[in-house]
Regions:
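Signal for well-folded cores of large energy- and translation-related assemblies
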Residues: 10, 50, 76, 91-94, ...
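Glycine-rich, often acidic, oxyanion-interacting loops/wings at catalytic, nucleic-acid
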Residues: 141-152, 180, 185-193
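Small-residue helix-packing motif on alpha-helices
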Residues: 86, 98, 121, 170-173, ...
Length: 193
C-alpha cells in the first residue's frame, strides 16, 4: 500500500521507529541494521515500507534501503516465515551476506537470528536458493562466447540481481572476476567494485 514514507525521525525504540510525515506519526517496525542507518532523532529520512495486514492488526515494516526491503519480501514469501522472523534474520546480517549464506547453504549464519532454528534456516535456503538463481536473470551467452560463465559466477550474478542490480549491471560487475573463486569471494569482489 505504501512504497515509502519520507519524514522526520521522532523516536527510536528497541524494534521500531516513529516517523512524522506531515503531522502523522507512523510506527514502523524495522531491523537493527535499518535502525542504525536511520541516524539520529530529528533527522529527515526515507523509509521503504511494507504494510502487513492480518485479521485484527495492521503492522508497518520499514527499511532504509530498497535492497533490505527486497530481501524482506523474499523472506516472507517462504512458508512459515513471518514478518517478525524476517526482521530477526535481517537484524543479524546484511542483504548481501544473507544472499551469500543462501547460495552457499550457510545454515549457521541464518540461525544466528533470534527464533530461527536449523529447520527454518534450511527451509529458507531451500525455497530462496532457486528464486535467487532464476530471479529475472537474463544472461546473453551469445555475446559472451569467449567468456562462458562458470557456475560460481552465475550464482554470484543471481545474488547481485536479488540485491537489486539489473542483470546487465550484475554481469558487468562479475565479468572480470576469476570464475574459479568461491561464490562468496566473487560477490565480495563485485560489491567492492
Amino acid at each position: 500500500m505504501y512504497y515509502y514514507i519520507k519524514g522526520t525521525l521522532v523516536q527510536k525504540n528497541d524494534n521500531y521507529i516513529v516517523v512524522d510525515a506531515n503531522g502523522v506519526g507512523y510506527m514502523i517496525y524495522t531491523s537493527l541494521n535499518s535502525m542504525q542507518n536511520a541516524g539520529e532523532v530529528g533527522k529527515k529520512i526515507t523509509i521503504y515500507t511494507y504494510l502487513h495486514v492480518r485479521e485484527d492488526v495492521m503492522d508497518l515494516f520499514g527499511f532504509t534501503t530498497i535492497e533490505e526491503k527486497n530481501m524482506f519480501m523474499q523472506l516472507i514469501s517462504v512458508s512459515g516465515v513471518g514478518p517478525k522472523a524476517a526482521l530477526s534474520i535481517l537484524s543479524v546480517t546484511t542483504p548481501a551476506k544473507f544472499a551469500v549464506a543462501v547460495i552457499t547453504n550457510d545454515v549457521k549464519t541464518i540461525t544466528k537470528a533470534s527464533g530461527v532454528g536449523p529447520k527454518m534456516a534450511q527451509r529458507v535456503i531451500l525455497e530462496l536458493k532457486d528464486k535467487m538463481k532464476t530471479d529475472e536473470l537474463e544472461i546473453d551467452l551469445e555475446d559472451e562466447s569467449d567468456d562462458i560463465l562458470s557456475d560460481n559466477r552465475s550464482e554470484a550474478i543471481s545474488a547481485l540481481v536479488v540485491l537489486g542490480y539489473s542483470s546487465n549491471d550484475a554481469q558487468k560487475a562479475v565479468k572480470g572476476i576469476d570464475g574459479t573463486l568461491s561464490v562468496e569471494e566473487i560477490i565480495k569482489k563485485a560489491l567492492a567494485g
